[in-house]
Each structure stands twice: as C-alpha cells, then as structure tokens.
Amino acid sequence: MPEVSVVIPVYNNAGTLPLALDSALSQEGSLEVIVVDDGSRDEIETVMERYTADPRVCYVKNPKNLGAAGSRNRGVAMARGQYVAFLDSDDCWAPGKLKKQLRLLEDTGSVLCCTGRELMTPEGKLTGRVIGVSAVISYRDLLRHNSINCSSVVVKREAALEFPMEHEDSHEDYIAWLKILGKYGPAAGINEPLLRYRLSAGGKSGNKLKSARMTFLVYRYMGFGKVKAAACFLSYALHGVWKYARAFLLS
C-alpha cells in the first residue's frame, strides 16, 4: 500500500498538468497519484498517455461534472494511502515536500500539515514572492485567516473522508480545514515555500469582492449565527487590510 495518495483534480489544464504530475512523482517515498478528470475538453487524455506505464498513476474521468470539490472527494474515496495530499493541476511541488511533511506529522501527532508557497506567474515563472505559514495553526487562528493553501496540504485519509469538501459557492477547502482542526486540534506548518502556486486572475479567489462574499459564506456554512459570522468576517477583513498595508509599506 502507498503511504501517500496524491489527488489531482483537473479540468482543461493540459498545458500545466505535466509539471504538477512530474513534481508529485519525483517525491521520495511510497505514493500513488490519482488524477480526476472533471470533463476536460482539451488534450488531457493525450497527456495522460505518457504516464500509462507508471503503476503509481491512476487516471479516472467523472461521468458528469462534479467541480473541484467533488473531484477531490472522489479522489479521496479512491485513495489507499494513510495520508492524502492535494495538488491542483496548475501548481507544483518543490523536491522533498512530502518527506518533510510526513516527518513533521509523525513528530507532532497532527492530522494535517501545510507549507509555505512561492507564487508563480500564469506562465509558470517563479516570482520570488513567498507566503509563509506558522509552525502551529489553531482553529482560532484559522477562523481569523485561512493560511492553509489546498495544494500544500497533507492530511490523514480518515479525516479527509470524515470531512469532505462541500459548498463550492464558498471556499470549500477552508470549511474542511476548519472542521478538521475543530475536531483534531492544530495543524502543523512548515515555513518553507515547498508549494509553487500559480497565480490566475480567473480563479475563484481572483475577484476580491467575490472572495470576501465566499468567506462570509464559509462562516455561515459552519453554522455560525449572523453576529458571530459578521465578527469573524470583520477579523478576516482587518487581516486583509493589514496584509496589504504591510506590503505597501515594505515595497
């Protein structure tokens, strides 16, 4: 059995998928890579033909469009590893990422580990801009600010199965992390840019107002009343103002 199951949802990203796949397959240790195709209309099948000889790679096509969350959930349901690692098809990992995370999970007893990230341009050029993470991320920390990037996460499979990703009209991964930390305790963080995250103006979070609305919905889907949801959202908004003010002052 593999120790880690890497789940890659893909939709019309034939141009970036090979970089993501190669970065996963080059990681040390025992792993499988599950590519879940959500009805792509580009050359995904042609890309995947290059990997048919690798027994670690499993390629499945959704019978109908499930969205990114549903595709990740399908991959988790198929996973055989003790841990699940998520990787979007337009991102990639630095060498040694999984090994470092598995070691930290073992040392800390946490069920979820995330890492820092370096931003890439839409064309795949590294920008040198790094976004770090804290060594320990509590449920309360996460309520104030979602510092956990999905493509950096390694999580115990049982926890991912218990709390699948839901509500794609919000930040579905954020809801899952909150539920996992709420039950199992703090996440462990590695403050190194082991994820290379591709910027995309067309992504779900590209529009700041849309992202803000989605964040408010996260708190509502968590079952918070309007007052508590508004208080959490205010904290989120203030953190965003501080982040951009700090970036401006340091520029």
Describe the function of each predicted region.
Residues 96-127:
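Conserved donor NDP-sugar-binding/catalytic core segment of glycosyltransferases
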Residues 23, 37-46, 64, 88:
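A conserved acidic beta->alpha catalytic loop
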Residues 77, 130-210:
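Conserved nucleotide-sugar donor-binding catalytic segment
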Residues 15-18, 42-50, 92, 96:
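Acidic helix N-cap motif at the loop->helix transition within catalytic regions
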Residues 62-79:
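Glycine-rich, basic loop-to-helix element that forms the pyrophosphate-binding segment
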